């Protein structure tokens, strides 16, 4: 199973490269990561609700090069929510992950780490 299309609450989610090894020594794949995030979603989503995320992506697995991403990519599905944060030189449209579809889309983007910022759509969290 290398590709899969799933409908989550009316949102079409295209999952790809599911057999790609993310943890080679353990034999764990992207499909394992997606299932993990699906399993923990009820516990994780309340903590990152309405918070802009800084993502750490590992496109070649945990042993490959990783990079941080703040800006929502142009190719993101239209249903992925963003929140503009004004910085000195530009505006960054951070991803907001409030639902399972977005969480699994992030996992499909090889986003192993998600770091919630200390701001939310309503303002600064105190």
Q: What function would you assign to each model-found segment?
A:
Residues 2-7, 11-125:
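Active-site loop/lid in soluble adenylation, ligation, and acyl-transfer enzymes
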